[in-house]
Amino acid sequence: PKVPLTPTQENELLDFMQNDPVYAKYYDEVVILLETGLRISELCGLTPADLNFEKRFVNVDHQLLRSTEDGYYIEAPKTESGFRQVPMSAAAYEAFERVLKKRRDGRCIEVDGYKDFLFLNRDGLPKTAVNYDAMFKCLAKKYNKCHKEPLPDVMTPHTMRHTFCTRMANAGMNPKALQYLSLIHISEP
């Protein structure tokens, strides 16, 4: 079952990550996921060209995927509405600034015309969903050992997206606006 983080869990998770010697390096990525509602493949595909700091939005028009047969490849959003501009909250803006400041040069890899990916693994190659799935699983295990309120049983990058959508809906965001931002499916009553 898809269970979002509670506001308390969200805050405690970020505090934990910020102060943990292993997971501090993932802090900005998790902040960005929680603040934008991006799919993990959309996050993985981001390059500096996708960030508009002046107007404070993230341009989403592609996603980075990887298969064992084909290696890395870029895919456009599945539908026309998948192309969107996602606002940067103050927290997301600051996280992106830190990411760019700390960014190291990776291998000169170009995938279907895209290069300079923001999030690289230790080998200097672009991260993909599988990197984050493993990280979230280990993060939840370590977090749950020292917190009374455990994280959901299934903890994945999609949990961050679900948390974003739930937080926005609870804050009273117009369902159509939320649908645009994160491309969630809203069932009519």
Question: Residue locations for each model-derived region?
Answer:
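Residues in well-ordered alpha-helical elements
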Residues: 8-11, 41, 49, 130, ...
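Short, basic (Lys/Arg/His-rich) helix/loop patches that form interaction surfaces
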Residues: 15-26, 36, 86, 102-117, ...
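Basic, Lys/Arg- and aromatic-enriched nucleic-acid-binding interface segment
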Residues: 1-46, 54, 81-83, 91, ...
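Generic alpha-helical secondary structure signal
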Residues: 5-12, 59, 131-138
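Residue-level detector of conserved, well-ordered beta-strand and adjacent loop positions
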Residues: 6, 14, 61, 89, ...
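Conserved tyrosine-mediated DNA breakage-rejoining catalytic core shared by Y-recombinases
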Residues: 45-104
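Conserved small/polar residues in nucleotide/adenosyl-binding loops
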Residues: 184-189
